[in-house]
């Protein structure tokens, strides 16, 4: 996204949001999980005061997890496929047009995309089926070590390319004029969405991991470690991609075009490009699979907490459901390409991404914050007690009003601005309809936070 939104100026705003918004929300999610020892299926039920309505967020949370995986499993499948394709030399000797055609051919092939999506789903649920200690902890730890090793090797190689320093300058020196040209609102919303997305906050995915945390460490310290690691991986990924693009005179952009068209073109021009390309997509595969496994664990835990299922049954049922639910995103590039839900040029994946990234992640974060700091939910005293339990950094005691008023206000303003920026070019009628939708979604969130419920 740094390439799309002007490089260092975007990164600076992203880091600000990460500290001021992302970190406090992550602490809130961890606190809810650790205090309840449950997923979002039951966490709010157990912690909310009598008559509160926060437990209804559990449904919104699970919808978010499913919708996210309905397209992310497909994207993770692309990563695995390209790791294989680069290693097997499928892209060797292809010019720019042929590389673009190769990616188009993948998207046109419903069978190939379905196969690799199924591989991702089965592999990830297989890890989760082993349980937390035997599967999740051991395998993700190995994956993270491999990921960090790969990212350092790839970044060092990228920085040694001729002309790479121009890319480093673009990446690390802010250009606010370029940001203004792109649109400050677009850049800010992109940075906000990225802060929520990279930390996986707002949908309840981190709540389940909070439920596995011990009481010996404070939650601010744990959250800070995760934020630093996440930021390191994100920034190092940029140091791999952007200097390499500048070294070979390729315009850095964003999205699938950058990863699956631009970068393979760069690798084709590079000495030993097949090896470096395979290593890059192996790194991307580890990164995407770690996200899939984390969200699948939340889905499994939700089913176990809500339905009382065994882990084995939760894995089998959700694996079958996920394969079926992921098919629309796959078919949206071929069989169902005529469906353009957000206007011309969009597809089913764009709609699913919009639902999660532009709606549930930011607004879900507001729900977690209000639950932890307001009188309508769990409350500030309970939150601080849980967050500060254990050794390590203590949560600032004087930021309650900031979290109660400022964080929700910032998120809501940028949320509405994001709708406006996205749909205003499509005309007043379309804009009006979608702004009404945004207000209805806000109303739903307001009902969850402030509504009263006599029965659960």
Q: Language-model features: where?
A:
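Membrane-embedded translocation segments of transport machinery
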Residues: 1, 137, 141-289, 293, ...
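Inter-helical loop and helix-membrane interface segments of multi-pass membrane transporters/permeases
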Residues: 2-5, 40-60, 73-133, 162-189, ...
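Membrane-water interface regions at transmembrane-helix termini and the short interhelical loops
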Residues: 4-5, 53-69, 104-108, 119-143, ...
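Select transmembrane alpha-helical segments in multipass membrane proteins
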Residues: 8-13, 52-66, 114-120, 180-192, ...
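Juxtamembrane transmembrane-helix boundary signature
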Residues: 13-52, 244, 248-251, 444-455
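Helix-loop-helix connectors at the membrane interface of multi-pass transporters/channels
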Residues: 42, 76-108, 211-216, 221-233, ...
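C-terminal membrane-solvent junction of multi-pass transporters and transport-like membrane proteins
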Residues: 57-64, 308-319, 354-415, 427-431
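Loop-to-transmembrane helix boundary motifs in multi-pass membrane proteins
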Residues: 114-115, 229-235, 286-289, 303-339, ...
